[in-house]
């Protein structure tokens, strides 16, 4: 037998319509101002965005939004969102989407608490502080909803690096299996 250590401080809220309670969960952690990060406009067309946003409003949480995260998230999108979070005075980042959105959220959360360039973290500068991170995961993938890692691509330098830090664990991850029901079986299983 090999000795090991295991730590996972992320709270998982699993079940149908759990995303409609995100405001309650965020309120429990003291969130007041959130940057919502997401990928495509499909989350608005499906009603998912409004379900989550309504919950935030019901719990007095102000928010701004930043959409357009792509697969293999980029530092340019992260920098854009960091500037928005700082200007807004965000205390939290809420990801609605898959692993790329959540990786972006983690980098944004760290960058919003840092005076330098967020890419510094991917070059070795340790994360000292981060905004609170929350997520509604819409695609099972790499386990980003329960880990401390973020992978970001620098499109200028053609580099793709990761960071790992205890400040980057999400506080609460919502998993509603219904949100993943339309994903192909092969994608979900493999």
Question: Each predicted region: which residue ranges?
Answer:
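ATP/NTP phosphate-donor binding region
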Residues: 1-92
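Structural motif
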Residues: 11, 33-35, 63-64, 91-94, ...
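A glycine/threonine-rich phosphate-anchoring loop and its flanking beta-alpha core
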Residues: 20, 113-190
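Secondary-structure boundary/capping motif
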Residues: 44-45, 73, 104, 144, ...
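Short Gly/Thr/Asp-enriched flexible loops that form oxyanion-binding sites at enzyme active sites
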Residues: 51-52, 82, 101-115, 146-147
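Glycine/serine-rich anion-binding loops at beta->alpha junctions
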Residues: 89-108, 138-144
């Amino acid at each position: 037998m090999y000795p090991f250590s295991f730590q996972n401080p992320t709270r998982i809220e699993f079940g149908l319509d759990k995303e409609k309670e995100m405001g309650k969960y965020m309120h429990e952690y003291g969130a007041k101002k959130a940057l919502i990060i997401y990928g495509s406009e499909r989350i608005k067309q499906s009603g998912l965005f409004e379900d989550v946003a309504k919950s935030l409003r019901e719990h007095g949480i102000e928010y701004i939004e930043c959409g357009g995260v792509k697969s293999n998230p980029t530092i340019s999108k992260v920098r854009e969102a960091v500037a928005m979070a700082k200007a807004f005075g965000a205390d939290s980042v809420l990801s609605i989407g898959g692993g790329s959105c959540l990786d972006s959220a983690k980098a944004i959360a760290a960058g919003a608490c840092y005076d330098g360039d967020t890419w510094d973290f991917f070059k070795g500068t340790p994360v000292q502080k981060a905004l609170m991170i929350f997520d509604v995961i819409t695609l099972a993938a790499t386990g980003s909803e329960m880990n401390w890692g973020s992978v970001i691509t620098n499109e200028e330098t053609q580099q793709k690096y990761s960071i790992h830090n205890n400040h980057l664990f999400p506080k609460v991850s919502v998993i509603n299996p219904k949100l993943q029901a339309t994903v192909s079986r092969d994608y979900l299983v493999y």
